Amino acid sequence: MVSESHHEALAAPPVTTVATVLPSNATEPASPGEGKEDAFSKLKEKFMNELHKIPLPPWALIAIAIVAVLLVLTCCFCICKKCLFKKKNKKKGKEKGGKNAINMKDVKDLGKTMKDQDDDAETGLTDGEEKEEPKEEEKLGKLQYSLDYDFQNNQLLVGIIQAAELPALDMGGTSDPYVKVFLLPDKKKKFETKVHRKTLNPVFNEQFTFKVPYSELGGKTLVMAVYDFDRFSKHDIIGEFKVPMNTVDFGHVTEEWRDLQSAEKEEQEKLGDICFSLRYVPTAGKLTVVILEAKNLKKMDVGGLSDPYVKIHLMQNGKRLKKKETTIKKNTLNPYYNESFSFEVPFEQIQKVQVVVTVLDYDKIGKNDAIGKVFVGYNSTGAELRHWSDMLANPRRPIAQWHTLQVEEEVDAMLAVKK
């Protein structure tokens, strides 16, 4: 008995110890990392089990996964872009506000600029003009002349003595000067000096006479114009000057030098038009010119009319072969003639001849002045060449055409050209 109870007492403590140890093991908390790993492994296990249940091959599953990833990435990209766009709009708004904001420095600068402009307006200067220096006047040379009046014969005597320091208008560094002298306002009578070749200091020593009653002289102006002669084109004006007759003392002879001024640009004077027909018969070698009419002729007489008639010259190589004239039509600027003239021209010569038509104003006392001139045939151009060509293309048929009259000197220069 004693031994049994002793054994129980000895065995009891270990039982109690075990009991106390077990509870401590059971209630010990699990670490957070271990819990998460268990949850993830459970989800993975579950997901894999579900995948195994789907009746699809592995490659199809991979494709679906890739598409899903792409969709996610696209969504992310769109969200980012939207955010960036909003930021940019905000920035723009700030900049706009900055631009519209008034800068006091700019206002001051603007005020200063406006003040400068007002100052310029008062003085009448622009920026370019402020810096520009006054240009020197172009020197055109000078002319020495003399004036006298013959009271006994009612004549104005104009002497063209010499010119000096003329500008060079020709290629060789010289000019071919001559002087034109006329009275305004009528311009009816014009005089010209001889042409002096290749010189800038010509000596003329020529005198011209205008028959003008002294009572009418005060209302006239004398013009002296220096020209450069050109054989093949229009003569260039070098310079001119005007002398009002009411400023001249005719109690003695006036002799002086005057500087040439730039000539006023004169409009091409209208001289009028003429209509004539041409007819050529090659077999007979006969050229017929019919002067039909003229219109709007230049006024040549004091009464504002003219006494026009027409001269026709047949020319070859600068020589006048034949000359014909119409009748004179009195006091008219629109004469009607209808007069026919014939010339013998062999067929082999027709391409070498020229028909020169000149309208003149008849004057009983003095020289008959040319109103205007035109020529057809060899070396002609424009409307004149077309008229001649039409005549040759239509033998035996009269071809009529209107022509504009040209200045006599210009036509003569063209006739002098040899091709």
Curated annotation (Swiss-Prot):
Glycans are attached at N25. It comes from Pongo abelii (Sumatran orangutan). GO terms for molecular function: calcium ion binding; calcium-dependent phospholipid binding; clathrin binding; phosphatidylserine binding; SNARE binding. Its cofactor is Ca(2+). It comes from the Eukaryota. This is Synaptotagmin-1. Residues 133-379 are annotated as: Phospholipid binding. Ca(2+) 1 binds at D170, D176, D228, F229, D230. The keyword 4Fe-4S does not apply. The chain crosses the membrane at residues 59-80. It is a single-pass membrane protein. Calcium sensor that participates in triggering neurotransmitter release at the synapse. May have a regulatory role in the membrane interactions during trafficking of synaptic vesicles at the active zone of the synapse. It binds acidic phospholipids with a specificity that requires the presence of both an acidic head group and a diacyl backbone. A Ca(2+)-dependent interaction between synaptotagmin and putative receptors for activated protein kinase C has also been reported. It can bind to at least three additional proteins in a Ca(2+)-independent manner; these are neurexins, syntaxin and AP2. Belongs to the synaptotagmin family. Keywords: Calcium, Cytoplasm, Cytoplasmic vesicle, Differentiation, Glycoprotein, Lipoprotein, Membrane, Metal-binding, Palmitate, Phosphoprotein, Repeat, Synapse, Transmembrane, Transmembrane helix. Binds 3 Ca(2+) ions per subunit. The ions are bound to the C2 domains. Ca(2+) 5 binds at D301, D361, D363, D369.
